[in-house]
Amino acid sequence: MTEVRRRGRPGQAEPVAQKGAQALERGIAILQYLEKSGGSSSVSDISLNLDLPLSTTFRLLKVLQAADFVYQDSQLGWWHIGLGVFNVGAAYIHNRDVLSVAGPFMRRLMLLSGETVNVAIRNGNEAVLIGQLECKSMVRMCAPLGSRLPLHASGAGKALLYPLAEEELMSIILQTGLQQFTPTTLVDMPTLLKDLEQARELGYTVDKEEHVVGLNCIASAIYDDVGSVVAAISISGPSSRLTEDRFVSQGELVRDTARDISTALGLKAHP
């Protein structure tokens, strides 16, 4: 086994990873204490109640302040929960809101299509599966919740891409590249852009075994009340059942479902 050498005197410093984890735990503890204290507290009270050195507490507060998770009252010097915490919570609530609104429409789509229904959101340069309603068929192909999907090579991923402005779309593709997963993955830029343009016109996109061999998927974008893409809804099934002759009828069904969810989220005019 290769020996790992660390600089400094033996036993003087903890491993970097351990120190980082400890700092994170202490930062979370500070935020939790502020929440229980009604949103604000003095540095001395935080230090006392969390059994932390005053200097350490102040240093952690400054780190949290840089991330906008806390801010300091210039008059009293007390520390308050900041806007960054609200933004994180709002993102969670927003995703949960999409799912709660989408629930009845997902069930209707599952019953009408006979296929498994999925809801995914974009997380950076990936799509993440956050909701699923399995079909009743004995033969079904389902990815577990939390699965990460490539944006360019999955139905949900392409549905999250096609509404984007060209500049943002190109930026994402250049960052992620066009990895090939199956023989039918779209791996050249002109073909992918043409596919996304067609999806934009139709209001839905089709994944023809582009991510998993034997699995087809049809997806459409979901918009919020201001017209921003917040999620994608899709149906997925074995290519032996979700065949090409069903793509148009099922695509329109998925598109109409996405529009109904968008309307329920407050969208007035559909793209």
Curated annotation (Swiss-Prot):
Any single Pfam family the record assigns to this protein: IclR_C
Annotated disulfide bonds: none
GO cellular component entries: cytosol
Sequence ranges assigned to domain HTH iclR-type in this UniProt record: 21-83
The keyword Repressor appears for this protein: yes
Listed GO MF terms: DNA binding; DNA-binding transcription factor activity; identical protein binding
Effect of residue 141 to A: No effect on repressor activity. Loss of glyoxylate-triggered dissociation from DNA
Key words, A-Z: DNA-binding, Repressor, Transcription, Transcription regulation
Keyword Repressor attributed: yes
Protein known as: HTH-type transcriptional repressor AllR
Organism: Escherichia coli (strain K12)
